[in-house]
């Protein structure tokens, strides 16, 4: 910073204390780039986090506009995964012919099993650990406080969606019911539920390479507005 104002900044926050993962971000005003400011900021912020004995440094970069990935690659960061974000600004979707009810604790085991079946392959491919979240009271309590909606068939969980503050998350269909149009119906329900709660736009994201999810969301009117790539550097 000088008399003309802030030229750039950097910050670091703990991402996962148990795993000693830290998020690190460096930003330089576009008008001040290629002057070594980013390098100086990274050096200074690195000194701060180095004293905490980190295991992994993680940073997220937006690549659909300017792509600063090369800056981090110079310091040894490697791409971890990509996550496009999409936005829906359309109207109410056609009413679906399946019933949804709010999630309750009694669905926990079925929900956890469905979550594992739906996301295990993605977790392994992208090194999202733990690959399987074991049944535990902390997870159960977290889910009980989420605005999750489930649909059942003969008391068996078919699928679910979380609808929170205009954001759709964990859209999933049990493998036994996949390929039958449930993914579309669950997403349509999520859109309508978000709109009924007052949302004027609805967002979601997915992991890069999940073409089925991408195609479904585009079919329903979602448009990509941001693409983030996450990079990490192992320190141990």
Task: Name these PLM-found stretches.
Residues 34-47, 74, 173, 179-196, ...:
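Conserved acetyl-CoA-binding loop-helix of GNAT-fold acetyltransferases
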């Amino acid at each position: 910073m000088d008399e003309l104002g802030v030229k750039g900044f950097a910050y670091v926050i703990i991402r996962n204390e148990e795993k000693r993962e830290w998020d690190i971000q460096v930003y330089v005003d576009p008008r001040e780039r290629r002057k070594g400011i980013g390098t100086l900021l990274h050096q200074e912020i690195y000194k701060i986090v180095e004293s905490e004995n980190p295991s992994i440094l993680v940073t997220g970069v937006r690549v659909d506009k300017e792509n600063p990935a090369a800056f981090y690659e110079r310091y040894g960061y490697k791409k971890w995964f990509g996550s496009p974000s999409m936005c829906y600004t359309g109207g109410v979707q056609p009413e679906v012919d399946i019933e949804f009810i709010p999630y309750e604790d009694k669905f926990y085991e079925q929900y956890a099993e469905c979550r594992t079946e739906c996301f295990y392959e993605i977790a392994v491919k992208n090194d999202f650990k733990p690959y399987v979240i074991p049944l535990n009271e902390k997870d159960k309590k977290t889910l009980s406080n989420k605005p999750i909606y489930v649909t059942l068939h003969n008391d068996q969980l078919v699928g679910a969606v979380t609808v929170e503050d205009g954001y759709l998350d964990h859209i999933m269909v049990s493998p036994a019911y996949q390929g039958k149009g449930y993914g579309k119906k669950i997403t349509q329900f999520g859109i309508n539920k978000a709109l009924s709660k007052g949302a004027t736009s609805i967002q979601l994201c997915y992991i890069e390479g999940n073409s089925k999810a991408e195609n479904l969301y585009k079919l329903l009117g979602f448009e990509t507005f941001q693409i983030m790539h996450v990079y990490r550097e192992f320190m141990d």
